[in-house]
Design a protein with these regions (language model features):
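Short active-site neighborhood of thiol/selenol oxidoreductases, capturing the structured segment around
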Residues: 60-84, 88
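N-terminal targeting signals for export/organelle localization
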Residues: 1-47, 202
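Sec/Tat-exported extracytoplasmic proteins
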Residues: 67, 92-99, 123, 144-151, ...
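Buried hydrophobic packing residues in well-ordered domains
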Residues: 55, 74-77, 88, 119, ...
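Hydrophobic beta-strand anchors of alpha/beta hydrolase catalytic cores
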Residues: 69-70, 104, 171
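Thiol/disulfide oxidoreductase modules built on the thioredoxin-like
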Residues: 139-196
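A short beta-strand-turn-helix
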Residues: 48-68, 92
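Structural microenvironment flanking redox-active thiols in thiol-disulfide oxidoreductases
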Residues: 83-143
Length: 202
C-alpha cells in the first residue's frame, strides 16, 4: 500500500471518529455555522489574527509553506490538553527530521486568562517549536468559529474566576496552502499520530 492510500485510509477512520465524537457529545461543531457542505470538502480553518507567546502578532499567512498541526485548549485544562500536547510532542519527536515540515500550534480558548506570558511558561513543558496563540475575546472566538471547534464555558458558581470549559479535543492537520487535510482525535496514540503525519508528508 502506498503512502497516499495509507493517508486516505487513516483519514477515513479519523473522520468517522470525529463525527462520532460530536454526535455523542450532542452539539454542533460550531454554533451559527452552516452544517451542510456543497463542495464535498470540509470547510475548516481560515483567516485569523492572534498573538503568539512572544507577543508577536501573527496571521494564518505566517504559516503558509508549512504543514500545521493545530490543537485548541487552555492552560488551566487539567488533563486532556496536556496529554494531547504530550502526544503531539512525542509524535513529532518520533518523525525526526521529517517533523521540520510541521509547525505545531496551540490556540487557547481562554482569552481572558491565557496571556502570552502564561502561554510561554506553559508551553515550555512541550515541543520546543510549539507556537502558542492567544488574543482578544473576539479574535479567539473568530479562530474557534473558523475551525468549527465545539466550546462551552462551564461557570463555577462559588468562584466565578475558576470557570472551566467543555471543548472538542482534536488535532487539525492543515496543508502547506492552509487548507484542511484531516481531523485527528486526541485519543490517537503517539504511533498513530506519527503514522498519519508521515503519510501526509510523503
Amino acid at each position: 500500500m502506498n503512502a497516499r492510500s495509507i493517508l486516505l485510509a487513516l483519514c477515513g477512520l479519523i473522520l468517522g471518529g470525529w463525527l462520532a465524537y460530536f454526535a455523542v457529545n450532542g452539539g454542533d461543531m460550531a454554533p451559527g455555522l452552516p452544517q451542510t457542505q456543497t463542495s464535498g470538502k470540509a470547510q475548516v480553518g481560515g483567516p485569523f489574527t492572534l498573538t503568539d507567546q512572544t507577543g508577536k502578532r501573527v496571521t494564518e499567512k505566517d504559516f503558509l509553506g508549512r504543514y500545521m498541526l493545530v490543537f485548541f485548549g487552555f492552560t488551566s485544562c487539567p488533563d486532556i490538553c496536556p496529554s494531547g500536547l504530550q502526544v503531539m510532542t512525542a509524535a513529532l519527536d518520533k518523525l525526526g527530521a521529517k517533523a521540520d515540515a510541521v509547525t505545531p500550534v496551540f490556540i487557547t480558548i481562554d482569552s481572558a486568562r491565557d496571556t502570552p506570558e502564561k502561554l510561554s511558561a506553559y508551553l515550555k513543558s512541550f515541543h520546543p517549536r510549539l507556537v502558542g496563540l492567544t488574543g482578544s475575546e473576539s479574535e479567539v472566538a473568530a479562530a474557534i468559529k473558523a475551525y468549527r471547534v465545539y466550546v462551552q464555558k462551564v461557570p463555577d458558581e462559588k468562584t466565578p474566576s475558576n470557570y472551566t470549559f467543555d471543548h472538542a479535543a482534536i488535532f487539525y492537520l492543515m496543508g502547506k496552502d492552509g487548507a484542511f487535510i484531516a481531523p485527528i482525535p486526541h485519543t490517537t496514540d503517539v504511533d498513530e499520530l506519527a503514522r498519519a503525519l508521515s503519510a501526509s508528508l510523503s
